[in-house]
Regions:
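Hydrophobic ligand-binding cavity/cleft-lining segments
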Residues: 1-45, 163-164
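Short, surface-exposed coil-to-beta transition loops
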Residues: 3-5, 63-68, 90-95
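Generic structural detector for well-ordered beta-strands
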Residues: 7-11, 55, 69, 98
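Glycine-rich portal/gate segments that line the openings of hydrophobic small-molecule binding cavities
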Residues: 39-88, 106-108, 140-164
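Beta-strand/loop substructures that line and gate deep hydrophobic ligand-binding cavities in soluble
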Residues: 82-140, 156-159
Length: 164
């Protein structure tokens, strides 16, 4: 599937936005409308190596568990997470958050999600509307991220090691 990219502009300094995003426990707050049942993979949820498992609430998704682990954390510019999802965790995923300074102290956040389906069946399932669905859900996540950082609104539950 072609990469899915969404972005938003947040009225906050880039360092503040980065500090929020580099804690994977915070990600459940702005993605819980389609990613649920979060569990951290280690106690330290900040920085390189931090990870989580979760279920993706997608229509017709029989194999809903996925995971993500931060593999690159370049303060305050970029965070890269890799993971797996789908049947037997055979679909590789790469998510990249890129933060750029904007006008008047704002921050432009761009999130790109790439998937690498392993089989013809996985590619077929993705071709049946997954790209549009992911774009809509991730665009909503960016709006929620902006509301949380700017106003403290639309907060979901923060995940813990034993689930949140």
């Amino acid at each position: 599937m072609d990469p899915v990219t969404v972005s938003t502009v947040i009225s906050a300094p880039r360092e503040q936005v980065f500090d929020y995003l580099q804690d994977i426990a915070n990600h459940s707050e702005f993605t819980d409308h389609f990613m649920v049942d979060w569990h951290l993979t280690r106690i330290d949820s900040v920085g390189r190596g931090a990870g989580a498992r979760f279920r993706v609430k997608a229509p017709g998704n029989r194999f809903s568990w996925g995971d993500a682990t931060f593999v690159e954390v370049d303060r305050p510019h970029r965070i890269v997470e890799t993971g797996r999802t789908g049947k037997n965790n055979r679909i590789r995923t790469i998510g990249t958050y890129e933060l750029a300074p904007g006008a008047s102290g704002t921050t432009r956040v761009r999130f790109t999600l790439e998937t690498a389906p392993a089989t013809f069946a996985d590619r077929l399932v993705e071709s049946l509307g997954a790209r549009g669905w992911l774009k809509r859900k991730n665009a909503r996540s960016m709006r929620r991220l902006r509301a949380i950082i700017e106003d403290g609104e639309q907060r979901g539950a923060r995940v813990t090691v034993a689930a949140g």
